[in-house]
């Protein structure tokens, strides 16, 4: 058992055989946990289980969890590549007990696995326990037979785990492997503990207390177990390696990088190879879990990881984007264990390629400035933090890249001055923002939510209902009434009006009561689930407690329903045409149109877009039933329901299914499209009528947008396009079907005529006489050389160059200057100097003299050919005279 994949399987299968549920790794973006940027431990997905908030159908679990530590408190980024065991991405093997077994079974299982299944020699293993955990100390003696000298008591946080300031906590027990006295270091707890001889391979956490405020700890009624073993560390030990980067997985990745860069895996570029191998894993897994490079949040951390790897690719001499070429090697090594890598392979490759292409320009600019500003520094010096901030703020060059680039020279960055510069920038931004007062008007809703509770939403079943006013808000404050002509927000005890959320706009309609009428123009959700009906009192006075008839605008709601259901159908159609990596990034569902943003690395072709539209309309024509059901969140996910990336969901979710499940690319037995959604939808897909995609565009890096119309809007769009086609056909005197061919023929004819016109103008310009420039035409001698100077009309600047080249050949030796006047009154000028005269006359200097006469500035080119322009074409003769004068002075 030597390979990483076999080690992972052995671990999981061992615990499965001992009554544990094998639970798939959760995504790297934690679900419903805003406190974490990335999943960084195996217990993260079980956090609510340990605290009793969530119930699972099992009491024992085992996982191999994807983890990232880069950014925030857990940040290993700067050390990766330069140490034997630091990674940004790693796998955490673990077993968990939720109130089932405790210390004795946990130690027994761990010992059996490492000694029997993994076959590690007992005399190479040492255990640690918390300083006063006598129970664990005794169990290691009893179960493992370890002598007391190899059961080490440790004080402090290293051997006591806490979820936070309050909550579950407990002592830890760690298993260490002894690499032998050939490597420096001492056992844990000793003065030499920081050495590399004794390596921790497994940590067992015994959750047996609940910590209260003030530091009081009470025993938990059902103690639990949380363990974690780094797969890469375990593999290194089992493969007889002292360095994680020497295990089979990394050897394969590093070999793939070395093959593409001709680098020596054991040579001076070893650190760069390791950085790329590690960061390739982190980048690929983050992208497969829905994170895309951006300038904030998780996307910015991903961008930093990617760009650090790309910087090292440049150090290896890669002249073209490299990272995307390595994804195949990664999927070969890890795709079987993590099929999401294979599903997202296309997206990963394209995202890496695009980012590296963009970053190479940034890298060139940043490194040039860095080299210039650090040229005078020596080993031990400190680089100016203000300059480092300028590189970051102006050129997009992250601080860690600056540090990394200077590290090899022994130069550090003044982080204090970098931080000061960052704070000054933030202060300027705050000062520049005058503020809108919007935040102040929002504070009223939180106490209202606590007082009134959630608004009961009736809108899934009905568009009309009765309700009573429970609160009125005007200008951010509660009021007792709203008079005729006044506007405000009305809160009701129940409502059929949909509050804006999930991309769907809020409902409009009318509230009526005895002597009262209110026009509702929008409905919003406040403080989570309090519905605020925004409107104006048209008649009477609206007071607290007023009973009302509530009527949603039926026609508008029907259009919104059709558009919302269409977004689900388009989502699935996009996946069918473009691939399983398609994931929603946002949407707008309004009565007159829909907009859908999704992950895709490149523009969609016209052919692909047509296929998407065809598939979507096939589903509409099926007139299949649209069903909704309430399910537990985990049940819905297991059933294959798609969730919106970044959206927070409760324990119970609404699942919307539509389309015939038997269709090609069907999602699952529940339907062709199955999504978590709280919006309103049609009863049958046929109610949508028609879907017409009207545009496709880019929103951000790796994010595309399509816009579409449905029902009456789609029909109007189709009719409008047909009218345009008929009008074009009539104008072209052909049929609608023949319009494209007729346009192509006309375009070819136009190009031919333009070429003929250009040739005629050039011939006319070179023909001499008044038509070609009058007195300015002809060849004359100035300062002992021949000068051909002409002003011409209707010849473009690009054609002036060819005229000058031709004239230079005719002259043999001399200077050619031609000014071309355009119809808008501007002018372009091109000057050519034959090769034998460039030592005496510089075309750039001559053309600048002409540009000044034309009212322009500058000009550029080579000593033998240069061009410029100016706004005043009437001064063409003066420009030629200026060139002649400049030749006279130079000669």
UniProtKB/Swiss-Prot annotation:
Q: Which SUPFAM superfamilies match?
A: Class II aaRS and biotin synthetases, Putative anticodon-binding domain of alanyl-tRNA synthetase (AlaRS), ThrRS/AlaRS common domain, Translation proteins
Query: What InterPro entries is this protein classified in?
Result: aa-tRNA-synth_II/BPL/LPL, Ala-tRNA-lgiase_IIc, Ala-tRNA-ligase_IIc_anticod-bd, Ala-tRNA-synth_IIc_core, Ala-tRNA-synth_IIc_N, Ala-tRNA_ligase, Ala_tRNA_ligase_euk/bac, DHHA1_dom
Q: Where does Zn(2+) bind?
A: 564, 568, 677, 681
Q: Which GO terms describe its biological process?
A: alanyl-tRNA aminoacylation; negative regulation of DNA-templated transcription
Keyword annotations for this protein, in alphabetical order, are: Aminoacyl-tRNA synthetase, ATP-binding, Cytoplasm, Ligase, Metal-binding, Nucleotide-binding, Protein biosynthesis, RNA-binding, tRNA-binding, Zinc
Cellular component GO terms, alphabetically? cytosol
Q: What is its EC number?
A: 6.1.1.7
Record Gene3D superfamilies? 2.40.30.130, 3.10.310.40, 3.30.54.20, 6.10.250.550, Bira Bifunctional Protein, Domain 2, Threonyl-trna Synthetase, Chain A, domain 2
State the superkingdom: Bacteria
Q: Per the entry, which co-factors are needed?
A: Zn(2+)
Q: Does the keyword Transmembrane helix apply?
A: no
The reaction(s) this protein catalyses: tRNA(Ala) + L-alanine + ATP = L-alanyl-tRNA(Ala) + AMP + diphosphate
Q: Where in the cell is it found?
A: Cytoplasm
Give the enzyme class: ligase
Give the principal location in a single coarse category.
cytoplasm
A GO MF annotation of the entry reads: zinc ion binding
Q: How is the cofactor bound?
A: Binds 1 zinc ion per subunit.
For this chain, the family text in UniProt reads: Belongs to the class-II aminoacyl-tRNA synthetase family.
Q: Which PANTHER family match?
A: ALANINE--TRNA LIGASE, CYTOPLASMIC, ALANYL-TRNA SYNTHETASE
**Protein task:** Catalyzes the attachment of alanine to tRNA(Ala) in a two-step reaction: alanine is first activated by ATP to form Ala-AMP and then transferred to the acceptor end of tRNA(Ala). Also edits incorrectly charged Ser-tRNA(Ala) and Gly-tRNA(Ala) via its editing domain.
The domain comment in this protein's record states: Consists of three domains; the N-terminal catalytic domain, the editing domain and the C-terminal C-Ala domain. The editing domain removes incorrectly charged amino acids, while the C-Ala domain, along with tRNA(Ala), serves as a bridge to cooperatively bring together the editing and aminoacylation centers thus stimulating deacylation of misacylated tRNAs.
Entry protein name? Alanine--tRNA ligase
């Amino acid at each position: 058992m030597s390979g990483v994949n076999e080690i992972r399987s052995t671990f999981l299968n061992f615990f499965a055989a001992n009554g544990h549920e094998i639970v798939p790794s959760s995504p790297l973006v934690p679900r419903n946990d805003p406190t974490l940027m990335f999943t960084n431990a195996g217990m993260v997905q079980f956090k609510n289980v340990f605290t009793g908030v969530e119930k699972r159908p099992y009491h024992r679990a085992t996982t191999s969890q994807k983890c990232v530590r880069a950014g925030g408190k857990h940040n290993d980024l700067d050390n990766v590549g330069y140490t034997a065991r630091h990674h940004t991405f790693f796998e955490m093997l673990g077993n968990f007990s939720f109130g089932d077994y405790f210390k004795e079974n946990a130690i027994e299982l761990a010992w059996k696995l490492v000694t029997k299944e993994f076959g590690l020699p007992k005399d190479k293993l040492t255990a640690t326990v918390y300083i006063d955990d006598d129970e664990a100390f005794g169990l290691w003696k009893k179960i493992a037979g370890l002598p007391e000298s190899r059961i080490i008591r440790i004080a402090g946080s290293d051997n006591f785990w806490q979820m936070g300031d309050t909550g579950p906590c407990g002592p830890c027990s760690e298993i260490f492997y002894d690499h032998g006295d050939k490597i420096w270091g001492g056992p844990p707890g000793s003065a030499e503990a920081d050495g590399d001889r004794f390596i921790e391979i497994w940590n067992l956490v015994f959750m047996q207390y609940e910590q209260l405020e003030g530091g009081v700890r009470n025993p938990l009624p059902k103690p639990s177990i949380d363990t974690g073993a780094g797969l890469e560390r375990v593999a290194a030990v089992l493969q007889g390696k002292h360095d994680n980067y020497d295990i089979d997985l990394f050897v394969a990745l590093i070999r793939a990088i070395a093959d593409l860069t001709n680098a020596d895996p054991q040579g001076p570029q070893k650190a760069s190879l390791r950085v790329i191998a590690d960061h390739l894993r982190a980048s690929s897994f983050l992208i497969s879990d829905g994170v895309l490079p951006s300038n904030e949040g998780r996307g910015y951390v991903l961008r930093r990881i990617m760009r650090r790897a790309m910087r090292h690719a440049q150090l290896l001499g890669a002249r073209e984007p490299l990272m995307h070429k390595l994804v195949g090697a990664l999927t070969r090594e890890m795709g079987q264990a993590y099929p999401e890598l294979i599903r997202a392979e296309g997206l990963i490759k394209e995202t890496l390629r695009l980012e590296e292409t963009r970053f190479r320009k940034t890298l060139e600019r940043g490194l040039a400035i860095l080299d210039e500003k650090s040229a005078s520094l020596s080993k031990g010096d400190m680089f100016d933090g203000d300059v480092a901030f300028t590189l970051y703020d102006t050129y997009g060059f992250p601080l860690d890249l600056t540090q990394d680039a200077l590290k090899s020279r022994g130069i550090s960055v003044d982080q204090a001055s970098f931080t000061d510069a960052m704070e000054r920038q933030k202060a300027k931004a705050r000062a520049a923002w005058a503020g809108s007062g919007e935040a102040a008007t929002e504070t009223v809703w939180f106490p209202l939510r606590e007082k009134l509770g959630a608004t009961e939403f009736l809108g899934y079943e009905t568009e009309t209902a009765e309700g009573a006013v429970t609160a009125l808000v005007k200008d951010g404050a509660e009021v007792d009434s709203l008079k005729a002509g006044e506007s405000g927000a009305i809160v009701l005890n129940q409502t059929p009006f949909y509050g804006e959320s999930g991309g769907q706009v809020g409902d409009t309609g009318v509230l009526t009561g005895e002597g009262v009428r209110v026009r509702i123009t929008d409905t919003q959700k406040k403080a989570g689930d309090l519905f605020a009906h925004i409107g104006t009192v048209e008649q009477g006075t609206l007071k607290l407690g007023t009973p009302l008839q509530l009527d949603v605008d039926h026609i508008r709601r029907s259009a919104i329903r059709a558009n919302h259901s269409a977004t689900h159908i388009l989502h699935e159609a996009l996946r069918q045409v473009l691939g399983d990596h398609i994931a929603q990034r946002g949407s707008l569902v309004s009565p007159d149109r829909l907009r859908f943003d999704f992950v895709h690395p490149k523009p969609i072709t016209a052919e692909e877009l047509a296929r998407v539209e065809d598939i979507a309309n096939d589903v509409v024509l099926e007139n299949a039933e649209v069903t909704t059901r309430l399910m537990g969140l985990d049940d819905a996910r297991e059933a294959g329901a798609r969730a919106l990336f970044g959206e927070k969901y409760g324990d119970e979710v609404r699942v919307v299914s539509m389309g015939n499940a038997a269709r090609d690319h069907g999602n699952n037995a529940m339907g062709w499209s199955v999504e978590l959604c709280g919006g309103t939808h049609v009863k049958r897909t046929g109610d949508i009528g028609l879907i017409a995609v009207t545009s496709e565009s880019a929103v951000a890096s790796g994010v595309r947008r399509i816009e579409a119309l449905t029902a009456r809007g789609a029909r109007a769009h189709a009719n409008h396009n047909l009218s345009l086609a008929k009008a074009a056909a009539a104008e072209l005197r052909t049929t609608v079907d023949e319009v494209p061919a007729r346009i192509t023929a006309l375009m070819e004819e136009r190009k031919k005529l333009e070429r003929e016109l250009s040739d005629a103008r050039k011939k006319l310009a070179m023909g001499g006489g008044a038509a070609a420039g009058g007195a300015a035409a002809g060849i004359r001698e100035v300062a002992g050389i021949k000068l051909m100077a002409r002003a011409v009309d209707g010849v473009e600047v690009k054609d002036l160059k060819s005229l000058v080249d031709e004239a230079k050949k005719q002259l043999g030796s001399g200077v050619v200057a031609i000014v071309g006047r355009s119809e808008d009154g501007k002018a372009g000028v091109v000057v050519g100097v034959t090769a034998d005269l460039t030592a005496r006359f510089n075309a750039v200097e001559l053309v600048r003299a002409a540009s000044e006469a034309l009212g322009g500035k500058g000009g550029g080119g080579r000593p033998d050919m240069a061009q410029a322009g100016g706004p005043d074409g009437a001064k063409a003769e003066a420009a030629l005279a200026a060139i002649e004068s400049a030749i006279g002075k130079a000669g």
